[in-house]
Amino acid sequence: MSKVGIVILNYNDYKTTRIMLDTIKSYRSIDHIVVVDNNSKDNSYELLKEYESKKIDIIKAKHNNGYSAGNNVGVKHLIKKYNVDYVIISNPDIIVESEVITTMKKQMDKNDDIKVLSPVIHELSKIKRGWMLPTYYGEMITICNTRQRFHKNYGLYPESHYNDLLSEVDVVSGCFFMIRADVIKEVGYFDEGTFLYYEENILGNILKKKGYKTYVLNSVSVTHNLSVSVDKSIKKLNKYKILIKSLMYYERKYNKRNIFAMIFLNILFVLSYIFAYIKNLFR
């Protein structure tokens, strides 16, 4: 019988993580839970350690090297110690019912074609499913921060794309998804070259190049209480800088952009950052 493990990454937000653990620790749909404390600066690790049991492992990362590195600690632990078949990557600010995980597991069990599976994500007043891998123009939109005002649907699939039970997409949200353990091991786990952001696009890019398929299961959903940990620990302009640094890494390494294309993106970033900084001064 296939086994499911879940990785929850905590950083300075033990209260949110504890709420999730209190909810999911009794779920029969999950065989093993690993909480990775990403070297929090509060007493998260000590407080979460109280939850350790036969089902729950609490691990402390030696250094906070970001989202991908922290999740890799948990994924490798699940695969090495418990030999799980499926790994769920989850933010601590996710609300998920046991039946959602059971339904996702059943789909993975009966369809070898599915390498990554995501539920529908309810995020504030929005619904997130999946998106297309970013184009060069799409990266310009991200850098200039004009998506919300002028390009809301750019890079998104039309609503009709999600009429069936399963919808194939390039990328799914990193806040909650299930991946085959042998697949994430084969691709070398998450790329630790980014600290935060773009890990989903990187994984989607790697999987697509290998011919592996990613799907959204439209019959189930979870709720995401958006970026609790990130909003608590990183200021807005710093988040923007981290985002663009990850974007540049992705474009350079995975899309093999030439030096002129990269220079243009960097110029856009400098101009956009100056504009955002000045705007922030007058708030």
What function would you assign to each model-found segment?
Residues 205-283:
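Active-site-adjacent helix/loop segment of glycosyltransferases
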Residues 60, 94-97, 103-187, 201:
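Acidic/His-rich active-site region of diverse nucleotide-sugar glycosyltransferases
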